[in-house]
Amino acid sequence: MSKTITKGSLTKEQVDFYNLEGFLVLEDFLNDDDLAGVRASMAARVNEIATDLLTAGLITNTFADSPFELRLAHLFEGLDDKAFLKYGRSWRDRLPGYFDLMANPKILDAIESLIGPEIFSNPVYNTRPKVPKVAAGAVPWHQDKSYWPDANANPVITVWVPLVDATLENGCLH
């Protein structure tokens, strides 16, 4: 099978799949260097949450020595739904690492393949930690396009970037 390249970084086959199915999975698309800034921003946010949880008496261990991939899950293990929703449902921090990820040329090139070169990002975005075995804060499949009246004439694409391997065991998009 030939790999016809479209304008942007995706192949014609990938674009056709997206247009037919409405989604596209690009495994190993971003490398550790691409994710370093957003992981650092996320780690700083997790440090703040650990301090808040400890100060509030909701945890006795900040799991400071836990690896990035596990620390947040460890912090949230014993929390009830109310505490989880306060600290883990939706982060709207404006941190440099998040912006760097949104402006990553690989991501923008892939999006260009799907909608063309006129790309803008809505300033309302969420960082939603997906923690294994936590149902609180789950968000069902939906389309954000309805939130923006002017969007009906334009394509809207959501880019989901897991910062750790997304598996059934450790939490994945479903």
Where does each model-flagged region fall?
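Non-heme Fe(II)-dependent double-stranded beta-helix
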Residues: 1-20, 27-141
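Catalytic core of non-heme Fe(II) oxygenases with the double-stranded beta-helix
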Residues: 94, 109-112, 135-174
